[in-house]
Amino acid sequence: MAHPHQHLLTLFLTDDNGFYSYLSEKSDDEALEDINTIKKYMDFILSVLIRSKEKLENIGCSYEPMSESFKALIKVKDDGTLVKAFTKPLLNPHSEKIVLDRGYTSDFAISVIRLSSKSSYILPANTKYINPNENMYINNLISLLKRN
């Protein structure tokens, strides 16, 4: 019997836009609930990766940034303010059919679900947006960057 999140996680992990098509058919509340479910599993996977990276570093293996190929999400403007910097174009959620991969991606999704349910990893609380103008740490960081 399939876990209730198996198909959702498989859709998300598949390298196409089917996940967006799926979300576009849901109500806002259902879509948000599904996104939070995905976020929970991504937090778990990131936790596993970070702990694994730390193990490599503990034995002297230098492991360069794991997110090297990603675009910047924020940038610092000349006046020191942080702004979002999205470079990906908008997508049409109805442009692709929903195809559920029943191969290795589905197997991986099942494994993540099972491993996360038995794991002793303590995951961080839900991430919240921080307004850079109201955060003293970020303001101090910006002032240091402005001086240099």
Curated annotation (Swiss-Prot):
Protein name stated in the entry: Protein J1 homolog
Induction context: Expressed in the late phase of the viral replicative cycle.
Listed InterPro entries: Poxvirus_J1 (IPR005006)
GO CC, alphabetical: host cell cytoplasm; virion component
Keywords: Host cytoplasm, Late protein, Virion
Task of the protein: Late protein which is a part of a large complex required for early virion morphogenesis. This complex participates in the formation of virosomes and the incorporation of virosomal contents into nascent immature virions. J1 protein is required for DNA packaging during immature virions (IV) formation.
Quaternary structure and interacting proteins, as annotated: Homodimer. Part of a complex composed of A30, G7, F10 kinase, A15, D2, D3, and J1. Interacts with A45.
A matching Pfam family: Pox_J1
Subcellular localization(s) per the UniProt record: Virion; Host cytoplasm
Ribosomal protein listed as a keyword: no
Entry's family note: Belongs to the chordopoxvirinae J1 family.
Organism: Fowlpox virus (strain NVSL) (FPV)
